[in-house]
C-alpha cells in the first residue's frame, strides 16, 4: 500500500494505526470465493447490469469472479462513504477516463466523486484502500507469496540501488527470502504507480524504495508467523477468516520520478510516498489448516 499526502510523502478491515484520523488509510478485503456462496446475491446487488454483462464476456470464470468481486467491493465502499443504500449503489458513477493521455479510452484509474480509494485483486482476494483525506494520493496492490514474477525482474524493475541490494540478498539469504523480497518490492512499486495513475505505462524502476536489512528481517518474520486473529480483530475469528500475520508496522519510504505529461518541459517531478505492507493469510475453506499467504 502506498500513501502520499500533500505535506508528506463480509468485507474485513484493518486500519493504518499511526496516522491522524484525517489521514488514516483503511483496507477492506473480500475473498473472491464469497461469490460462490450464499452471500453472492447480497454482493451482486451492488452491481449494475452493464458490469454483470461485462463479466459474462470474460474468457474464464476466474476472471469473471475477480471482476465482479472488485466492482462489488468498490461500490460497497463508495456507498458507505456517500451514504447511498446498497440498492442504489449500482447507480454510483465511476469515471474510468485516463488523465495521462488524450485517447479518450476508459483505461484510467477508477474515480468516484467524493471517495478517495484504490483497488487491487489477485485470485483469491480483492482489496480496496480508502482514505477520508481527499488530497491523499493512494494506491494499493496485493500479490500471493508464491507469485511468479516476470523474467528479468531485477534488471527491468529495479533501480541501481535496489538492484545492488537485491544482488546482496541473493548471495546472503535463502531463495525463499529473496523471492519474498521481490514480491514486497513489486507490490510497493505497483501501489505507487497505481496511486499516480501511471500503472505500467512507465518503467517500475522509476519508483525507488528505501530498503534496509531490518525491513527484510521483519517481512521474513511476519510471513513465517501464524498469529491468531483476523482483520476485524474478533476474539473468536471464524476458521476461514482472512488473518493478519503480524501487528508490527512494516513501513518504508519511496520516491517516484514522474514523467512530464504531454508537452510539459523540464525535469521529471519527484514525489515521495509512505509505504506499508500488510501480510495476510486466507485459510482454505475446506481445510483451514492450510492457508494461502499474500502481501498487501
Which ranges hold each PLM region?
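Core catalytic alpha/beta fold that binds nucleotide/phospho-ligands
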Residues: 2-296
